[in-house]
């Protein structure tokens, strides 16, 4: 009996590595030392930072993965994986430096895995982050046929003096919300239930002319390059930032707000995108549940000094990023620190 007889095909794993090598190398930065295949990936941090603080993050894509597998859409789920990780470390002002992925399946399908890793490599390249390594695990009997799981890991760096930790946030600071590309990678257990119960055809078209399934599978927006540019040009104006992930607008912005302060968010400041309006209508989802589950069209938030907000908005306009003033920092309302009206 061989390892292949037991369900593990080493040749398929080697074929995958050869397939993805050119994709991965396109994401490399000058600081990457060596190539793929070593026991550890190497990255030279010297020369760029005086007092670097490393910022790490790890995440998955939740049950959006289930929908991707159901639809056979494997080429963009890797972008989601990158976005969930790099947008998180960006919150503290860090530049994502490198990324590693974990791909696990019961039986390795080289074409599927290559499509997934290709998306990861593309997301890394778009974020200026090197896909420096990863693990492909073929584990017979652990996953049903055709299914796989993903996890991502990233490390970024920021000068100690430029670290954003929320300590600078003050009463009266302005919240500037940057548009999301859709639900990103959160709320998909509820999304899948609504989608199944609604019985909507895959070709169903939303009010803006977008196919429903395209809106649901739109890759997570990558905020790294535009936000790093803002930090470089207007860094003193930005007191904190938030990535709107699980917990929605209700639970994410408040994570970077000091005790004693709260948030007033004006829901009329922007229009709920059609995909979220469809989900709320078809799922009979209450407003409070929408705010707590989905990003509702706001994927990233800048918390800025009010005197500098207009300059930040002009800089966002210059980058063609849709944005809105969605609220402000206020004294906390007792136990209710976040109000959305």
Swiss-Prot record:
<comment type="pathway">
    <text>Purine metabolism; IMP biosynthesis via de novo pathway; 5-amino-1-(5-phospho-D-ribosyl)imidazole from N(2)-formyl-N(1)-(5-phospho-D-ribosyl)glycinamide: step 2/2.</text>
</comment>
<dbReference type="InterPro" id="IPR016188">
    <property type="entry name" value="PurM-like_N"/>
</dbReference>
<dbReference type="InterPro" id="IPR036921">
    <property type="entry name" value="PurM-like_N_sf"/>
</dbReference>
<dbReference type="GO" id="GO:0004641">
    <property type="term" value="F:phosphoribosylformylglycinamidine cyclo-ligase activity"/>
</dbReference>
<dbReference type="GO" id="GO:0005524">
    <property type="term" value="F:ATP binding"/>
</dbReference>
<keyword id="KW-0436">Ligase</keyword>
<comment type="similarity">
    <text>Belongs to the AIR synthase family.</text>
</comment>
<dbReference type="GO" id="GO:0005829">
    <property type="term" value="C:cytosol"/>
</dbReference>
<keyword id="KW-0547">Nucleotide-binding</keyword>
<dbReference type="GO" id="GO:0046084">
    <property type="term" value="P:adenine biosynthetic process"/>
</dbReference>
<keyword id="KW-0067">ATP-binding</keyword>
<keyword id="KW-0963">Cytoplasm</keyword>
<dbReference type="InterPro" id="IPR036676">
    <property type="entry name" value="PurM-like_C_sf"/>
</dbReference>
<protein>
    <recommendedName>
        <fullName>Phosphoribosylformylglycinamidine cyclo-ligase</fullName>
        <ecNumber>6.3.3.1</ecNumber>
    </recommendedName>
</protein>
<dbReference type="GO" id="GO:0006189">
    <property type="term" value="P:'de novo' IMP biosynthetic process"/>
</dbReference>
<dbReference type="InterPro" id="IPR010918">
    <property type="entry name" value="PurM-like_C_dom"/>
</dbReference>
<dbReference type="InterPro" id="IPR004733">
    <property type="entry name" value="PurM_cligase"/>
</dbReference>
<dbReference type="Pfam" id="PF00586">
    <property type="entry name" value="AIRS"/>
</dbReference>
<dbReference type="Pfam" id="PF02769">
    <property type="entry name" value="AIRS_C"/>
</dbReference>
<keyword id="KW-0658">Purine biosynthesis</keyword>
<dbReference type="GO" id="GO:0004637">
    <property type="term" value="F:phosphoribosylamine-glycine ligase activity"/>
</dbReference>
């Amino acid at each position: 009996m061989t390892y292949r007889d037991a369900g593990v095909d080493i040749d398929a794993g080697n074929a995958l590595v050869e397939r993805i090598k050119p994709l991965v190398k396109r994401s490399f930065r000058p600081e990457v030392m060596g190539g793929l295949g070593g026991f550890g990936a190497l990255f030279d941090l010297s020369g760029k930072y005086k007092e670097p603080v490393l910022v790490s993050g790890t995440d998955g894509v939740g049950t959006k993965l289930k929908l991707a597998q159901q639809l056979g859409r494997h080429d963009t789920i890797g972008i989601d994986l990158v976005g969930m990780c790099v947008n998180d470390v960006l919150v503290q002002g860090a530049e994502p430096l490198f990324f590693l992925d974990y791909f696990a399946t019961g039986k390795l399908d080289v074409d599927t895995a290559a499509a997934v890793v290709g998306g990861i490599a593309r997301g890394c390249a778009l974020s200026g982050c090197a896909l420096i390594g990863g693990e492909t695990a073929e584990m017979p009997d652990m996953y049903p046929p055709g299914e796989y799981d993903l996890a991502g890991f990233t490390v970024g760096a920021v000068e100690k003096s430029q670290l954003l930790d929320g300590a600078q946030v003050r009463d009266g600071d302005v919240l500037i919300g940057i548009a999301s590309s859709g639900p990103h990678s959160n709320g998909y257990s509820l999304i899948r239930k609504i989608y199944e119960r609604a019985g909507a055809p895959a070709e169903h078209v939303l009010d803006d002319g977008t196919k429903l399934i395209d809106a649901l599978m739109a890759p997570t927006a990558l905020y790294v390059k535009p936000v790093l540019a803002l930090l470089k040009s207007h860094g003193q104006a930005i007191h904190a930032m938030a990535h709107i992930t699980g917990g929605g607008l209700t639970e994410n912005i408040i994570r970077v707000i000091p005790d004693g302060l709260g948030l007033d968010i004006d829901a009329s400041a922007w229009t709920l995108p059609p995909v979220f309006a469809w989900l709320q209508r078809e799922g009979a989802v209450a407003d409070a549940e929408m705010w707590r589950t989905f990003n509702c069209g706001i994927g990233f938030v800048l918390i800025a000094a009010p005197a500098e907000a207009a300059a930040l908005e002009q800089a966002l306009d210059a980058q063609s990023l849709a944005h809105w003033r969605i609220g402000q920092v206020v004294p906390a309302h007792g136990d209710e620190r976040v109000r959305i009206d």
